[in-house]
Amino acid sequence: TKDTILFVGGGENESPAVWALSGNTTQKVSTQAIDDILQRLTADEVADIYGWSYGQAGHYFVGFSLPDTCLVFDTTTSRWHERQSRVTETTGAIDTISYRVRGFATAYGRLYVTDSRDGRIGVADIDTYTEYDSVIVRTMATQPFQNNMDPFFLPYLEVTIESGVGNAACPDPQITLQISRDGGKTWSDERARSIGALGQYNRRAVWRRNGRTS
């Protein structure tokens, strides 16, 4: 941000973390989950981390590109998320790589981005749901639900969404649900719900009969 610098670092014999430097004050901003990802890197991989930043729609993001993923901090909400890109190889197989965007620049009323894979220039648009013709897949995991360690039933689950956002590229966007009953080690089959075609603003994403926890 204007008065703050974010960086990856750590003292001697300390594991790397993300820190915010504001004036003469340093504050750790990475969570335990982010620290766990950074601690798996070698010293050379930590040295090769590439940072970038940009602002859009009232949010200011700072990203750190790693070999297999990209860690992004939203300074407006103080929340983290990961970004990756899906690319189609010459064999037709779909591969997942670290977020391919490496640079941002605002010009002519648009936010332009650079591409680390083949050098193309793109535009970051919050109303576009593809990345270089590949559909963007977003994954969110909730905090574990528990009832004082006792089993419980989950008869009804609804995700509050902005519905009716389909467009020509994705006329019927979907949201899918998977449930883990063993702490995230295994997951149920996907159950899909429509987010709503363009104009279906009252569409709701509801899952019923979700079973019992063990």
What role is predicted for each listed range?
Residues 2-6, 10-214:
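Beta-sheet repeat architectures centered on beta-propellers
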